[in-house]
Amino acid sequence: MSDRMSLSLAQSDPDVAAAIDHEVLRQHEGLEMIASENFVSRAVLEAAGSVFTNKYAEGYPGRRYYGGCEFADVVENLARDRAKQLFGAEHANVQPHSGSQANAAAYMSIIQPGDTILGLDLAHGGHLTHGHKLNFSGKLYRVASYGVRKDTETIDYDELEAIAVREQPKMIIGGGSAYPRIFDFARMRQIADKVGAFLLVDMAHFAGLVAGGAHPSPVPHAHIVTTTTHKTLRGPRSGLILCRQEHAAAVDKSVFPGQQGGPLVHIMAAKAVAFREALQPDFSKYAQQIVDNARALAAALAGHGYRIISGGTDTHLMLIDVFAKGILGSEAEAALGKAGITVNKNAIPYDTNPPLKPSGIRIGTPALTTRGMKEAEMKQIAQWIVSALEHRNNESMLERIHGEVTEMANQFPLYGWLREDAEALAR
């Protein structure tokens, strides 16, 4: 083995090593409030960085196209079995590289190109893969969309049913990326059955809440359920498909060889670890605390005069109308970033502003909850958000808030064993 193979990252590539160290400090010293982000455990990090990254394993356990897959089979079977146990599903495919690829494979397992799909409009909280014209879903399928009412900013299921009757979709999609309320899965299944459609639920954002019992499960109602494995589930960035046994063969063929070649065995190992963590009793407390924190934060921001889309949240996320205060979402994102609070700009329902300068911001609580923060911290964070937005053009004020944010972050330490090298670099 060459000497280069035994070099540390810092020795082999100091530029990448420095970027990682700086990212470690960024994550520790700030408040991560992007709703789709979280912090994985040390065990998940170790599995994701394991020697399984070297292994090719096309096919499925016991049916591989390569030799030497006996231990790859072990971790994939562990991941599949744990996913089924966690969500009460009959079948699980843990090979999708991402939520988008999970959706693509799931769609192609039950419908054909040119068929009609009915999903939540992206502008009302849906996702690109639910029918956006620039996405594969909008190019391969005929797209119909449902949205939220203008007065309540929640889904009108009578209107959804009327659209389904009119459009006759082959598949109805539940789930989204910026909808703060619980979907009525039972009603959606009734509508799907009425028009002869499949019901697919994309629970990427709230899968961890489902796993922890803090959110109703779509599994008993949907023909197929897809999800990412990060976000509230607190695993590696990847995908997962759950389905009834009758769809298992079609789903598996659609993933491999339909969408992908070899799976990422090191990521399947990390998924297995994350699923085991989510099966532990303390994960239920974690999931409920995410929701409690989100509600406390939304209430605190509302108390400061900010309009919360739909009036609140039932999940881990909320949308804030900052344009009502004369602030663009892009301006709010930038100001909060300078204050050490990471959020993302986001359109709100019936937004008249362009996508890159929308009227809202999206905020989530999974990552802060992972660090151990609770309702008291949410109230303080709300005050910082309000102050940063009010003083968005005052660099010294934003810097002062950032200092206070870092003081709080230090009370909830993150990745201490990694920070040793990062802090040495900073010195």
UniProtKB/Swiss-Prot annotation:
UniProt pathway: One-carbon metabolism; tetrahydrofolate interconversion; Amino-acid biosynthesis; glycine biosynthesis; glycine from L-serine: step 1/1
UniProt entry keywords in alphabetical sequence: Amino-acid biosynthesis, Cytoplasm, One-carbon metabolism, Pyridoxal phosphate, Transferase
Entries under InterPro entries matching the protein: PyrdxlP-dep_Trfase, PyrdxlP-dep_Trfase_major, PyrdxlP-dep_Trfase_small, Ser_HO-MeTrfase, Ser_HO-MeTrfase-like, Ser_HO-MeTrfase_PLP_BS, SHMT-like_dom
GO biological process, one term: tetrahydrofolate interconversion
Cofactor(s) of this protein: pyridoxal 5'-phosphate
Site-annotated residues for Plays an important role in substrate specificity: H230
The EC number(s) this enzyme carries: 2.1.2.1
Subcellular location: Cytoplasm
Residues bearing the modification N6-(pyridoxal phosphate)lysine: K231
Molecular function GO labels: glycine hydroxymethyltransferase activity; pyridoxal phosphate binding
UniProt key word Cytoplasm: yes
Quaternary structure and partners: Homodimer.
Record's function text: Catalyzes the reversible interconversion of serine and glycine with tetrahydrofolate (THF) serving as the one-carbon carrier. This reaction serves as the major source of one-carbon groups required for the biosynthesis of purines, thymidylate, methionine, and other important biomolecules. Also exhibits THF-independent aldolase activity toward beta-hydroxyamino acids, producing glycine and aldehydes, via a retro-aldol mechanism.
Family as reported in the entry's similarity comment: Belongs to the SHMT family.
Database matches in PANTHER family: SERINE HYDROXYMETHYLTRANSFERASE, SERINE HYDROXYMETHYLTRANSFERASE 1
Protein name per the record: Serine hydroxymethyltransferase
Species assigned in the record: Acidobacterium capsulatum (strain ATCC 51196 / DSM 11244 / BCRC 80197 / JCM 7670 / NBRC 15755 / NCIMB 13165 / 161)
